[in-house]
């Protein structure tokens, strides 16, 4: 099992920073919408878990990457709901959304990079097997 060093893993660092900002933003949600607050926290922790799983199991990057991107889109929608209910300011939403966009771009690049390595590896095996015959 291969593990990426967490200090060198920029996506993880960026996402941890996003989580800290998100926690500060969720403090203003009233008790009547505790479900929304808990759901946002759970989804954001699922993204963190998937990022960590990708760093430990690089063979499943595509599967976890798809989950990360879907959960980021869901977080974006839920943050918009917070703005509509006036629990966060437009400035705060803009800051959080920009961080999510940057994280999403990093994940997309990571997925594209891992796919190109997989294509290279499978074509290398295919070429090697042709030479043996």
Describe the role of every protein-language-model region.
Residues 1-133:
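Amphipathic alpha-helical assembly/interaction segments
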């Amino acid at each position: 099992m291969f593990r990426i060093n967490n200090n060198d893993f920029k996506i993880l660092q960026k996402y941890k920073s996003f989580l800290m900002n998100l926690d500060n933003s969720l403090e203003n949600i009233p008790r009547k919408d505790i479900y929304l607050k808990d759901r946002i926290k759970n989804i954001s922790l699922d993204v963190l878990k998937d990022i960590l799983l990708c760093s430990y199991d690089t063979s499943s990057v595509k599967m976890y990457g798809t989950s990360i991107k879907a959960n980021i889109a869901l977080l974006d929608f839920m943050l918009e709901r917070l703005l509509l209910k006036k629990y966060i300011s437009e400035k705060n939403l803009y800051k959080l959304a920009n961080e999510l966009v940057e994280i999403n771009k990093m994940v997309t690049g990571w997925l594209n990079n891992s796919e190109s390595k997989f294509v290279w590896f499978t074509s290398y095996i295919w070429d090697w097997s042709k030479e043996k015959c």
